[in-house]
């Protein structure tokens, strides 16, 4: 598969699916959490994707690419933290928490791989297809 946009990256697809699942689950959380936990976890989970898209747009410059990937990774860690709060507040059951936490860890691992070896993703590297099909 040829990578034409950030949307083609497996890490983007996984992060997007995670954000959408968090959105669906959080719709049933108490109204008093609307502007705190619910808002925070939705924003953080969505920011993983938006920062990844920004990183992709800035891949002409390695430092900018890495900076935005780092932001994406940070938002993923924040999402994981909010999942812990949701569990401890009784808004998530342990099986949903475990499953979503595993998804966060997988996204983090994929982002970590990109951070360790950013060169295949940079614009000056023509052969994106063969080197990025697993992410």
Outline where the language-model segments fall.
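Short, C-terminally biased terminal segments at protein or domain edges
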Residues: 1-135
């Amino acid at each position: 598969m040829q990578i034409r946009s950030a949307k083609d990256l497996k890490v983007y697809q996984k992060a997007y699916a995670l954000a959408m699942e968090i959105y669906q689950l959080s719709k049933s959380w108490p109204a008093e959490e609307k502007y705190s936990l619910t808002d925070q976890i939705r924003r953080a989970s969505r920011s993983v994707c938006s920062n990844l898209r920004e990183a992709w747009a800035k891949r002409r410059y390695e430092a900018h690419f890495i900076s935005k990937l780092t932001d994406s990774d940070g938002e993923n860690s924040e999402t994981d933290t909010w999942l812990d709060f949701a569990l401890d507040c009784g808004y998530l059951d342990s099986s949903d928490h475990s499953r979503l936490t595993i998804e966060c860890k997988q996204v983090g691992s994929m982002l970590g791989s990109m951070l360790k070896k950013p060169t295949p993703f940079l614009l000056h590297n023509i052969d994106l297809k063969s080197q990025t099909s697993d992410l």
